[in-house]
Regions:
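Non-catalytic cap/lid and distal C-terminal segments of serine-dependent acyl enzymes
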Residues: 1-176
């Protein structure tokens, strides 16, 4: 109901991308490097295939803005897309996100894992175009997490992501 009017007026559209977490992040029986490879393929699908397809389907004007939104590992995907491809995604909303992907991919031991580990790559110089991101709209990154007993990892990760963004001088809006 909160966005019903915007949807009805055609000002906002929602698209849902299927996840491949079972073959990537959550594939516990698969080597971390292979999980990172699958994650990179998914990232490329979202940014190089799905996003352009959404714009094409709608005959989008040049100023059309895409936002990525997700919950749990989807929040990680949304924020990762925004940080790595700010020219494609104007913003991201992460809800109860799990941003410390070392629990899925291991430590950022190689460039492929590092490219998909925002808490790690935000700390590395030259991996994210911070100047481009800093020019983005205020609050183009929104992070939210609840405080229930089941939110433990998400609450810790959400705070860590907000801190990492702030340390880089990137605007973030945090709600916990």
């Amino acid at each position: 109901d909160a966005i019903a009017q915007l949807l009805n007026e055609g000002k906002v559209q929602l698209f849902c991308a299927d996840s491949i977490d079972a073959e990537s992040l959550l594939a516990g029986d698969t080597a971390p490097r292979r999980r990172a490879e699958m994650q990179e393929k998914y990232f490329n699908y979202l940014t190089s295939e799905l996003a352009p397809r959404i714009l094409t389907l709608n005959g989008a004007k040049k100023d059309t803005l895409l936002w990525a939104v997700g919950v749990d590992t989807g929040a990680y995907q949304a924020v990762n897309c925004r940080l790595r491809r700010p020219e494609v995604f104007a913003g991201a909303i992460g809800l109860s996100g799990l941003y410390d992907v070392s629990r899925f991919l291991g430590n950022a031991a190689d460039d492929l894992v590092l490219r998909n580990a925002p808490l790690a790559y935000l700390a590395e110089e030259g991996l994210v175009d911070k100047k481009l991101l800093a020019k983005a709209e205020e609050n183009a990154l929104l992070l939210c997490a609840g405080q229930g007993s089941y939110e433990g990892d998400a609450l810790v990760d959400t705070q860590a992501m907000a801190d990492a963004l702030t340390d880089c001088g990137l605007p973030v809006h945090l709600e916990v």
